[in-house]
Amino acid sequence: MLTPHKIINLQNHFLIAMPALQDPLFKQSVVYICEHNDAGAMGIVINKLVTRCTVETILNNLKIVSPTRDPSVRLDNPVFAGGPLLDDRGFILHTPIKGFGSSVNISSKAMITTSKDILETLGTPNQPKDVLVALGYSGWDKGQLEHELMENTWLTAPANETILFHTPIIDRWRAAAKILGIDIYNIADQTGHA
């Protein structure tokens, strides 16, 4: 049985919002947990977008132009609203590649980078294979996420790179729940405790 004092490690897992969660920031959201320990948790929402913002918009605003830019690489990919904290800072989820100034391995298939040097590789032969650019992150203080799990706010599922990087954005909530064999649309809006 999960108690508020028992810490489970959800790094490299998805948090899947239960249908009853009506907070507009997290309604029908999927959060990829990048870090989880006894001090709290940090993750990136992977299915909410920043309105009218693309990777190219960010590169142009930061005046990042690479001489090795490959015009065949599309930069019109959307930018994700990673969460309400530090929503003016970039958090880039990507397949692991070494050499960036501020990166943390999350798993063997995902890494997060917050340094500007990764932006300079986007659209070049040096960019990581898969990239998800987000502004902001979601965070939980010590015990807060565990409390929300006990309140049935979230489902949890092991993350996979297909949903993280390739599943159409509109389908990610449902696809993440399907990892558990659940059709999220068949779950009641109200939950209770026995």
Swiss-Prot record:
It comes from the Bacteria. Gene3D superfamilies: VC0467-like, VC0467-like domains. InterPro entries: AlgH-like. One of its GO terms (cellular component) is cytosol. Belongs to the UPF0301 (AlgH) family. This is UPF0301 protein BPEN_258. It comes from Blochmanniella pennsylvanica (strain BPEN).
